[in-house]
Amino acid sequence: MRKLRLIAYFVLLAAPAWAEVSEVRFPIGAGGVGFLPLLVMQKYGLIEQYAKQAGINVHVRWINIGGPSVMNDALLSGSADFMAAGPPSFLTLWDRTVTSVRVKSVAAMVSMPMYLNTRADRVKKFDDIGDRDRIAVTAIKVSIPSIAMQMYARQKFGPSDVYHYDKNTVTMTHPDGVIALLSGSGAVDAHFTSPPFHQRERKDPRVRTIFTTDDVMGGSSTFSMVSTTTKFHDQNPKVFDAVLKALEEANRRIVADKKTAAEILLASNGGEKGFSVSEIVDVLNDSHVKFTTTPEKVMKYATFMHSIGSIKNQPASWKDFFFPEIQGAPGS
């Protein structure tokens, strides 16, 4: 009996302090090209495959929610284990949780620009936007387009008028923004949008692009990224590693077979209704659309947002808000 007790004692010593999760809850994101890697991960069960290789049987429950505020709430409430959003939304959440659950990013997901399109005859360049012109964006003040326009406003008008264009913005989904712009109804004068909606608008010869996020970011920048809490990262190292490897493989699959990737996007709940496979393939072939886990210019967002008071904490480096597993990448 004493021998059995000793064996049990040493088995307990060798066992981990906790078992890793058997289920991962992952919001599918807002849909579209920027969240396509998640759809590929779901389609091929990539997280499950890599977890199994690590000796863990895990079920992934994909939650059909999108939009940064909803996903932020899901992560903070414990009803989701990961979230995917753009840099401004992520940085807002990172800043809020520095002294609590410490949300950090697993990796970037997609880099691509957003485009300010108009069909107004009088608007030939961004500086022609007047006080009464309405610009459709997905979210006022904290979306990528809103931050980009704040950056431009500071360059043009100085720090005292950084929110100059906020009064011009109205909230619309990308599909509604396309309809409003192309219809000429007067509901909006411009639409700040992303692929594939940008390409759809530019097929109309009356539509021109007057500004892009690349203009203020100085080149390619991260559009979407995956995040989780420090607690999940620390308590589930094998599952975390499986998620990162699954994301990297999803990006490789998209690059290698764009037609299949386009079909996956169009077949999903987040697919773009009214688009053809060939249209989506054209978008995926665009050199400005990059499927990469390497963060690009996320630190530039952080520095700017801190400078105008949108976040309170000033990171010293992009590595301050990414987990160590991705810090070997040439990020920024």
Go through the PLM ranges and name each one.
Residues 305-332:
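Conserved C-terminal helix/tail region of periplasmic/extracytoplasmic solute-binding proteins
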Residues 2-9:
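Sec-dependent signal peptide recognition
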Residues 234-312:
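Secondary-structure end/capping motifs
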Residues 15-19:
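Sec/Tat signal peptide C-region and signal peptidase I cleavage site
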Residues 48-56, 214-218, 285-294:
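Short, solvent-exposed loop/beta-turn-alpha elements that line the ligand-binding surface or hinge
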Residues 20-162, 166-171, 185, 189-195, ...:
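Short, glycine-/small- and polar/acidic-enriched structural segments
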Residues 158, 163-170, 175-267:
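Pocket-lining segment of extracytoplasmic ligand-binding domains
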Residues 42, 46, 70, 74, ...:
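Extracytoplasmic/secreted proteins, especially bacterial periplasmic and envelope-associated proteins
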